[in-house]
Amino acid sequence: MKIDVTTLEAKKAGSVDLTDGVFALEPRGDILHRMVAWQLAKRQAGTHKTKGRSEIALTGKKFVKQKGSGGARHGDRKAPQFRGGGKAFGPVVRSHAFDMPKKVRALALKLALSAKAKSDNLVILDEAKLAEPRTKAAKDAFEKLGLKSVLIIDGAELDANFALAARNLPNVDVLPVQGINVYDILRREKLVLTKAAVESLEARFK
């Protein structure tokens, strides 16, 4: 699969051959859904908590005698049916993460890359570098390329000027290749890969 390479000035800079096994797979919405659910569950804080009846700071004394009152039988005021009592089956601090096989995770990433390539939302950039960290320079470059909602993946090391310039722009994310993930790919309309990122990804999936 051959695709044109462009520069930040929107000029053609040759072409690159993409591996079909990484960028030309048939779409699988079920795998992508599983992967996004896994990512979102994994990043949940899980710090929500309510107090059960054993944690409420009240006396445990039985407040009404067992028989003869004419009312229902009760133990102490910490029971869930009373105001100020403990919560029955409330949330506890826990991890929401669940297991996902490595092969499924790898497949999901390849499917996300393939989905962008198939929908013509994949752009290959010669390099993501700027002479100085100016947001206007990055904004002008993205406008020339027609990029409004975009995830930009560079090589293992980001260009500091480019990363700083793009940081203030809305709907623009810049990540090193080791940070690439399915959720961020799908949440942006366009995916931009530098040539260095393409080489790293293809080496990773060999």
Curated annotation (Swiss-Prot):
Coiled-coil ranges per UniProt: none
UniProt record, GO biological process: translation
Q: Which domain of life is it from?
A: Bacteria
Region (Disordered), start-end ranges: 65-85
Task: Write down a Pfam family by its short name.
Answer: Ribosomal_L4
The record describes its quaternary structure and partners as:
Part of the 50S ribosomal subunit.
Its recorded name reads Large ribosomal subunit protein uL4
Entry-linked InterPro entries = Ribosomal_uL4 (IPR002136), Ribosomal_uL4-like (IPR013005), Ribosomal_uL4_dom_sf (IPR023574)
Q: Which GO terms describe its cellular component?
A: ribonucleoprotein complex; ribosome
Name the PANTHER family on file. Answer: 50S RIBOSOMAL PROTEIN L4, LARGE RIBOSOMAL SUBUNIT PROTEIN UL4M
**What gene is this protein translated from?**
rplD
Q: Where is the signal peptide?
A: none
Keywords, ordered alphabetically:
Ribonucleoprotein, Ribosomal protein, RNA-binding, rRNA-binding
Which molecular function terms from Gene Ontology are attached? Answer: rRNA binding; structural constituent of ribosome
Does the entry feature the keyword rRNA-binding, yes or no?
yes
